Amino acid sequence: MKIRNAQSKDSFSISKICKNDLIQLTNKDEIFKNYEIYKSCMYMPTEEKFCNLIEKYLNEKSIKIFCCKDENKTNGMIVVSFIEDNKIEVFGIAVDTLHQHKGIGSFMINNLIEKFNLKYILAETDNDAVGFYRKNNFAITQFEKIYNNTKVIRFKCELIK
């Protein structure tokens, strides 16, 4: 089987997978079920860390958690903070491994842009995901950051509409 990146002609298939919209998640038990998906965008993930992070997010009014579903199965999740009107910061974006490289991550970003009339999106990522942001026309700036006394390369990703 050959896997290719999604193209604009695939948008109908992608919208079928995601039911044409993102669903905001507010129930922590429902969110907790998605650990296996979301852990791919966490640093040294554990279920306990995930649950604590979600609890923190749910207590912050500016942070929203959205998912993309097919039937009752979550295919992707995105966590964003609304900085101010028309501006968000992406805290995490993840797609189920069975559905990666089908355009679902791009669909989630584009759906948020349309739904909230976004003019600016900020994200920070590592080398594993910078290609996703580059493919979605984000401007990329590389910088160094210290994690656990270790210098790591990070990327600031910005999309200005």
PLM regions: where:
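Conserved beta-strand in the GNAT
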Residues: 67, 73-82, 87-94
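Short hydrophobic/aromatic beta-strand or adjacent loop that forms the aromatic wall/cage
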Residues: 63, 150-156
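A short beta-loop-alpha structural element at the N-terminal edge
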Residues: 2-34
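Conserved acetyl-CoA-binding loop-helix of GNAT-fold acetyltransferases
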Residues: 95, 101-114
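Conserved GNAT acetyl-CoA-binding A-motif
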Residues: 114-127
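Active-site rim helix/loop that mediates acceptor-substrate recognition in acyltransferases
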Residues: 31-32, 36-70, 77
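Acidic/histidine-enriched, beta-strand-rich ligand/metal-binding domains
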Residues: 47-50, 91-100, 131-135
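Conserved active-site alpha-helix within GNAT-family acetyltransferase domains
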Residues: 127-150
